[in-house]
Amino acid sequence: MSIFTPTNQIRLTNVAVVRMKKGGKRFEIACYKNKVMSWRSGAEKDLDEVLQTHSVFMNVSKGQVAKKEDLLKSFGTEDPTEICKQILSKGELQVSEKERSTQLEQMFRDIATIVADKCVNPETKRPYTVNLIERAMKDIHYSVKATKSTKQQALDVIKQLKETMQIERAHMRLRFILPAKDGKKLKEKLKPLIKHTESENFDQELEIVCLIDPGCFREIDELIRCETKGKGTLEVLSLKDVEEGDEKFE
């Protein structure tokens, strides 16, 4: 006896569903549990480790696959992999209230850990503990966004915490060595991007050791490469400039 199975139905088990409404229709993708947040945070980069199948569904639990014409109309493409990426990034993860609560608590902790790792008290150059950052986040009533990466949210938290406490991103320590003919002109262009100059030696070449905001690194690197046509050098001496010692602000 044969059992008829419709070709547009796929049965899946132990699945995490991510849903998106677009063009008046509901679309879903089937993912492995615990992998959706890893993808969104950037920890997991292999799509095949996240998706149980590259198919796009109208309803995962019923195994109903979306029609190609609906995909084209709503997403402007029939490429299931590209559509899966869109839904994975912007869709809503369907979880129980208990699972959602646990997930958000973990993200809250992860965000606080990133902030504590990247920041210091600007007056003392001492780092803050994760617990203190968590308390500060609660004081400003920070609400975790499940669809946004923890790294991006950490940057948002730093901006908000600056309004209520002494905090800033720890500076990077750099050394540039610039050809003499480019040195003076390039130094003027670099000035606005430098927080503090520790030393400056001008002999046959211009050598500067300085502190910068990590957010300026890419611009500085590009400026030196372009202006010196690859003859200048840029060396990262330390990723975080903090005071020596184990003391942390509680």
Swiss-Prot record:
It comes from the Eukaryota. GO terms for molecular function: ribosome binding. Belongs to the SDO1/SBDS family. One of its GO terms (biological process) is cytosolic ribosome assembly. It is found in: Cytoplasm; Nucleus, Nucleolus; Nucleus, Nucleoplasm; Cytoplasm, Cytoskeleton, Spindle. InterPro entries: Ribosome_mat_SBDS_CS, Ribosome_mat_SBDS_N_sf, Sdo1/SBDS, Sdo1/SBDS-like, SDO1/SBDS_C, SDO1/SBDS_central, Sdo1/SBDS_central_sf, SDO1/SBDS_N. Keywords: Acetylation, Cytoplasm, Cytoskeleton, Nucleus, Ribosome biogenesis. Required for the assembly of mature ribosomes and ribosome biogenesis. Together with EFL1, triggers the GTP-dependent release of eif6 from 60S pre-ribosomes in the cytoplasm, thereby activating ribosomes for translation competence by allowing 80S ribosome assembly and facilitating eif6 recycling to the nucleus, where it is required for 60S rRNA processing and nuclear export. Required for normal levels of protein synthesis. May play a role in cellular stress resistance. May play a role in cellular response to DNA damage. May play a role in cell proliferation. The modification N-acetylserine is found at residue 2. PANTHER family: RIBOSOME MATURATION PROTEIN SBDS. Associates with the 60S ribosomal subunit. One of its GO terms (cellular component) is nucleolus. This is Ribosome maturation protein SBDS.
